[in-house]
């Protein structure tokens, strides 16, 4: 149930971002960023943790409000990396939003450069106690969408590369949070290279998606999937139009025996292309056709 509510909140946040990005003469505001955060987190909640000595502690995560506690991360190299202090967060976010609006108006930075630098500066502030990554991704796509670029996704398989690009930029910028929050473009070159490549891949995939219509070509998690056995594509299309279809019905529509249908289903489930709908019965298709 919690996962379903989080998914609904994410969808609402995505729609908010897209609608706001479509209003070209509306500047970015701190209030919009906080509203996105409140939408994603939905409500305040308490986090309980055990300290090294076994002592219990707790604190409240506030939806839509900047952090009231220091936050940091342990890097993959074992170092503790500090983000901006709570008392400087509001001022740094004001600087960030003002800078963005001014730079967008000037038009000297490309949309990719603008989005990459905003993302890096935002991450160095880490203004909320939770949900910073989700907000960072939404605002990056807000910036790209305002300039008619495709949305990007940092997929789980690419997270290590993403974190390494940030780390290399951190080495050039330095560890002081306030300096990171005002970093210049030439100081974040490792992250800019990574980000530019990510956008280029999304554009390339979008072009392929639009120009390569084929019944057997589908897309999953940003990757092209070509089925060499046509029955895979056929069964997926049946599931899309008939989510509650039964195995017996699939057997009849495909003209194959029941064990063959079960092998197809098992393969599709194993790869994550479909999943059973627990409460409603039937199937949910998670892969996208190119035609």
Q: Can you say where each PLM-predicted feature lies in the sequence?
A:
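FIC/Doc superfamily catalytic core
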Residues: 1-130, 134-291
């Amino acid at each position: 149930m919690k996962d379903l509510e989080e998914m609904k909140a994410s969808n609402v946040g995505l729609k908010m971002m897209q609608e706001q990005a479509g209003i070209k003469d509306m500047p970015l505001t701190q209030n919009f960023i906080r509203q996105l955060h409140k939408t994603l987190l939905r409500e305040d909640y308490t986090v309980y943790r055990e300290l090294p000595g076994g002592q219990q502690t707790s604190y409240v995560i506030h939806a839509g409000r900047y952090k009231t506690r220091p936050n940091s991360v342990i890097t993959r190299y074992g170092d503790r990396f500090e983000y901006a202090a709570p008392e400087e967060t509001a001022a740094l976010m004001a600087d960030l939003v003002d800078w963005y609006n001014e730079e967008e108006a000037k038009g000297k930075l490309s949309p990719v450069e603008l989005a990459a630098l905003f993302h890096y500066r935002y991450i160095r502030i880490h203004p909320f106690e939770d949900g910073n990554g989700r907000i960072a991704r939404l605002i990056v796509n807000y910036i790209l969408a305002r300039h008619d670029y495709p949305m990007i996704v940092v997929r789980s398989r690419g997270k290590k590369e993403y974190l390494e690009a940030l780390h290399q930029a951190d080495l050039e910028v330095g560890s002081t949070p306030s300096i990171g929050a005002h970093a210049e473009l030439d100081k974040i070159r490792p992250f800019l290279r990574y980000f530019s490549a990510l956008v280029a891949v999304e554009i390339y995939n979008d072009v392929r998606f639009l120009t390569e219509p084929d019944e057997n070509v589908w897309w999953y998690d940003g990757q092209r999937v070509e089925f060499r056995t046509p029955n895979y594509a056929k069964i997926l299309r049946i599931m899309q139009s008939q989510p509650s279809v039964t195995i017996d019905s699939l057997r009849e529509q495909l003209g194959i025996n029941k064990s063959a249908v079960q092998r197809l289903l098992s393969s599709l489930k194993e790869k994550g292309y479909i999943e059973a709908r627990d409460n409603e019965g039937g199937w949910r298709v998670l892969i996208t056709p190119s035609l």
